[in-house]
């Protein structure tokens, strides 16, 4: 028996088809969210870097997953505030420094710095939680990279420094969960190794008497950032083949000791 014979007339057949259309369309699978169009977080309008000088209570702890419990703050700190403008994020000296002045481990072997990163929206309200809560911590991670320039075949070319011993600095993630609680709160758990974020981290400078640009990049991955059970190192966001983009990428100037050797790349750029 045909569908037309069952319905009895073309008019009844048309009514039946109109009734079935909503049922069929309701069974379609839900389209996946396009993270390129819907990041599930706002874009920051302000970035605040706070650098706090500290001492390692036991220098041997540096290679054994140090936490905030392993340092003692000296009370010296610098703050850099960058505001989003038509020319990108620019540092305001009225609201902080334009570069960070630090000491190398050659000058003081136990010196280390706590680097804290805060993002604010257009209303100047803290929005760090948007990159962490509701599973966003699984796809976000800060990286702290350095790039070098070489004059090859008549052109200046830029390369990422991929060997950690050539960086001139070293970094450790010291994030805690919950992210908005003190590290020594009863509910706080150290997650700097298992789930590196970089909103809080320890950095020290192993090369003496130089200045450079530290590229601080917040990765937004389109898949879990932990690859085969491993997190990517702080100095290379391309260490594993993870589909990603950057939410933020900023060059921050550091002057180590007297800053005699200039590795910012600005001299090469001006001579080109």
Describe the residue ranges of each PLM region.
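Sec-dependent bacterial lipoprotein signal peptides
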Residues: 1-25
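Bacterial Sec-dependent N-terminal signal peptides
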Residues: 21-49, 55
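Extended, polar beta-sheet/loop recognition surfaces of beta-rich domains
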Residues: 31-32, 125-183
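N-terminal onset of structured domains
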Residues: 34-42, 77-146, 243-245, 250
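Exposed beta-sheet edge/beta-hairpin loop segments within beta-rich domains
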Residues: 38, 99-113, 179-243
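Post-signal-peptide N-terminal segment of Sec-exported extracytoplasmic proteins
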Residues: 50-89
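A beta-strand/beta-hairpin structural motif
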Residues: 82-102, 158-202
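Short beta-strand elements
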Residues: 229-272
């Amino acid at each position: 028996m045909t569908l037309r014979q069952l319905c009895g007339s073309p008019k009844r057949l048309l009514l039946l088809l109109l009734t079935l259309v909503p049922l069929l369309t309701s069974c379609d699978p839900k389209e996946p969210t396009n993270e390129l169009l819907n990041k599930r977080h706002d874009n920051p309008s302000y970035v605040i870097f706070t650098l706090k000088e500290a001492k390692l209570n036991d220098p041997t702890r540096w290679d054994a997953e140090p936490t905030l419990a392993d340092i003692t703050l000296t009370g010296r700190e610098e703050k850099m505030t960058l505001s989003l403008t038509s020319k990108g994020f620019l540092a305001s000296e009225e609201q902080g420094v334009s570069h960070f002045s630090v000491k190398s481990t050659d000058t003081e072997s136990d010196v280390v710095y706590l680097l804290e990163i805060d993002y604010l929206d257009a209303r100047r309200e803290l929005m760090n939680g948007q990159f962490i809560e509701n599973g966003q911590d699984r796809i976000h991670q800060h990286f702290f990279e350095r790039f070098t320039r070489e004059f090859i075949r008549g052109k200046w070319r830029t390369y990422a420094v991929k060997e950690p011993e050539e960086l001139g600095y070293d970094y450790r993630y010291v994030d805690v969960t919950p992210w908005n609680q003190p590290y020594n709160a009863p509910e706080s758990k150290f997650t700097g190794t298992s789930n590196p974020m970089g909103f809080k981290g320890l950095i020290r400078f192993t090369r003496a008497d130089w200045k450079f640009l530290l590229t601080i990049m917040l990765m937004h991955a389109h898949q879990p950032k932990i690859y085969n059970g491993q997190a990517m190192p702080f100095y290379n966001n391309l260490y594993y083949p993870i589909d990603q983009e950057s939410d933020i990428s900023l060059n921050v100037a550091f002057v180590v000791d007297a800053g005699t050797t200039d590795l910012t790349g600005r001299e090469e750029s001006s001579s080109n």
